[in-house]
Amino acid sequence: RPSAAARRLATGQSGTLGIIFPAERNNLADLIFTEFLGGCVERAGDLGYDITLAMARGNISEEAVYRRTVRNARVDALIISSPLIEDPRPALLHSLGMPFIIHGRTRSTVPCPFLDIDNRGAFAAATRLLIDLGHRHIALLNGDCRQNFATDRLAGFRQAMQGKGIAVDRQLLCEAEMHEETAYHQASRLLALSQPPTALLCSSIGQALGVRRAAGERGMTIGRDIALIAHDDRLHELRAEAFDPSLTTTQSSIGDAGKRVVELAIDMLREPERPLPREVWPVDLVVRASTPPPAAA
C-alpha cells in the first residue's frame, strides 16, 4: 500500500476521508455513532483509505473546523453525520469546493449526495402493525425533530394513524435525544396517564430499555401487558433478539450504512463526472414477541 505522501504526489489526493463533529454531541459515547464509524473505518481500510476525526470544542466553532480542514487539504472528502433539517454544512462545503456525502438527508438547496433509509415507510409499517393488532392508544418516543430522520418517522406514524381514521394524541408524542434514561422518564409519564398507551414505538433499542424499566416498575410486562416496537440499528451491544421478550423492530444496519457511505464517497472521488449518489434503503419490519394485542382484547 503506498504511503500517504506517495499517494499525494501521484494523485493529488491524501487517501483520507474526514468526519467532524461538535464536542457537545458526545458522539464517541453514542453506540449508534460508534457502530457507524466502525463500518466507515472497516470499509475505508479495505479500499486503501483512512478515516480521520476532528472535534469542534471550546471557543472554536464547527464551521471554523470545517474551513480549517478544507484549507489544510488533509482529506479528500468529508462525511456529514447526524444532519439537521436546516443544516449549514452542505452549503458551506459546496462553497468551499470540498466533496462530501451525507448519512441522512437535509433540506439544503445545494446538490447533496446522500445515503438514507426509508424512515417514513418504516414507522408507517410499524404503526400499521400495532393498529392491525387492535391498538389505538399508541405512543411515539422519537428522536430530535430538528433532524430529518425524526421528522420522517413522525410523518410515517401520522400517516398510518390518519390512514386508519385514528386521531393522533399529542400527549403520546415525545421527542428528545435517544437515551435510555430519557426514555425511562418519558415512559413513566406516559404510563401514569389516566388513559395510558397500550403500545409504544421507539426510535432506538436504547429507548426500549428505558420503556421496559418504566413498565416493570408498574408491574407491567412487555409482550403481555403492553406492546413495544423499536428501531434496530443492528448494534453489536444491543440485540433485539436477546431482549426479554424478543423485540419487534424496524431493522437496518448502521454499520453497513457506514461501509456504503465510504464506498459512495470514494466512487465520487474516482469518477467525479458521474451523477451524485442518492440512495434510500428499504427497512425490514421483523415481528417478534413484544407485540401482543391490547391487554383488554
Regions found by a protein language model. Name each.
Residues 136-137, 168-172, 222-228:
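Short acidic capping loops at alpha-helix termini that bridge into adjacent secondary structure
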Residues 16, 99, 137, 198-199:
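Residues that mark the start of a beta-strand
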Residues 188-189, 193-297:
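Flexible loop/turn connectors
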Residues 23-35, 53-62, 115-125, 141-186, ...:
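Hinge/beta->alpha junction and helix N-cap segments in small-molecule ligand-binding domains
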Residues 12, 16-128, 132, 190-192, ...:
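Alpha-helical recognition/docking segments in bacterial nutrient-uptake
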Residues 3-14:
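Short helix-loop hinge/linker segments at domain boundaries
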